[in-house]
Amino acid sequence: MHSNQNYSLKSSNSFNIKASCSRIYFPSSLAELQQLPDLSAGNTSDNFYILGEGSNTLFVEAQAPIIIQPKFNGISIVEQDDHFVVTVGAAENWHDLVCFCLEQGIYGLENLALIPGSVGAAPVQNIGAYGVEFADFCQEIQWYEFASETLHSLTKQACRFAYRDSIFKQERYNKGLITQVTFNFPKAWQANLSYAGLDTLAKESTAKQVMAQVIALRSSKLPDPKELPNAGSFFKNPIVNDADFAQLQQQYPKIPHFPQKNGEIKLAAGWLIDQAGLKGFRHGDVGVHQQQALVLVNYGSELGAEIISLAKYIQQKVAKKFSVSLIPEVRMITHKGERSFSSLSDLNPIENITVIGDSNSIRGSSDD
């Protein structure tokens, strides 16, 4: 199995943060997975991180833990009478998969075009955009368990997908890694145009037309990480109960909201940040994107801690204005492995800053 020591991770995270690990492994087969050091609970389970393409990762410290970057590739298609079964290696690029499927006449993922990252990372977060989620087409996940050194097949139901959540962030967290994903795409396809920005398309639009519109929308709102380092949406869209929403709507009648099946209401985190006066806000070499307030950008910092301080500042401002808590979607990695945002208590929010004017300027003052 290929591995490296003292490996730089700067080009392996879309924030372009300077970090390195003592060792990185690149397993590409079951035999190579079985050659990994003992990562089962009670050994080094807190001191490693499974890295995809680094598009949803923030290295908080200069020293990262042991890194495992699976290299399972390949795509296979089995055509049935009324559906396609597509099996994909975890290391395949997500957007490339979307394009490949459409080229093969397999539709369903077009709303998820241009989402950065690998296929293996998609089920962990249950990625979603423009009214579609990964879980909508998942059939099965192949998962390697560290303790037993065996592969397991998990059904869609067993994965317990929820909004930006799955069993891989819960009971099976750090107990194994995803090697392969199997999708089920019905041949009976209808465009999902329910989301704002897509509702201007004709009902007869093709999947390629939908994908083109999604790409145009994302490109107009989200900066290219290669040009302006970022990790896409930094915070999850918060979900509140109907009573709390009623109070918010009374005060802010135009607040964007999305009713959920369970009766709760999903809010737009980007709108909340914008209304808090932080769109385009910049502090030193980190800031909030000028077109999409949900995206935090790195203008040249090499320190993940500076992104954390900015995020905590945003969190405080939104909580003060709306009494709504923003929870990061991006994963926080220290030398001990992944940590929750709230546990990073030694990193303080930006202090003595007041947003003035058009929110692109800042000045020092006492922050009330």
UniProtKB/Swiss-Prot annotation:
**Signal peptide annotation:** none
Domain (FAD-binding PCMH-type): give its ranges: 17-188
Q: Which GO terms describe its biological process?
A: cell division; cell wall organization; peptidoglycan biosynthetic process; regulation of cell shape
Keywords of the record: Cell cycle, Cell division, Cell shape, Cell wall biogenesis/degradation, Cytoplasm, FAD, Flavoprotein, NADP, Oxidoreductase, Peptidoglycan synthesis
Q: Which cofactor does it need?
A: FAD
- Enzyme superclass (EC): oxidoreductase
Q: Which pathway is it part of?
A: Cell wall biogenesis; peptidoglycan biosynthesis
Q: Where in the cell is it found?
A: Cytoplasm
PROSITE patterns, per database record: FAD_PCMH
Q: Name one GO cellular component term.
A: cytosol
The record's catalysed reaction(s) read: UDP-N-acetyl-alpha-D-muramate + NADP(+) = UDP-N-acetyl-3-O-(1-carboxyvinyl)-alpha-D-glucosamine + NADPH + H(+)
Q: Does the keyword Cytoplasm apply?
A: yes
* Keyword NADP in record: yes
Principal location listed in the UniProt entry? cytoplasm
Q: Which GO terms describe its molecular function?
A: FAD binding; UDP-N-acetylmuramate dehydrogenase activity
Q: What Enzyme Commission number(s) appear in the record?
A: 1.3.1.98
User: What does the UniProt function comment say about this protein?
Assistant: Cell wall formation.
User: Which family would the database say this protein is a member of?
Assistant: Belongs to the MurB family.
What is the protein name given in its UniProt record?
A: UDP-N-acetylenolpyruvoylglucosamine reductase
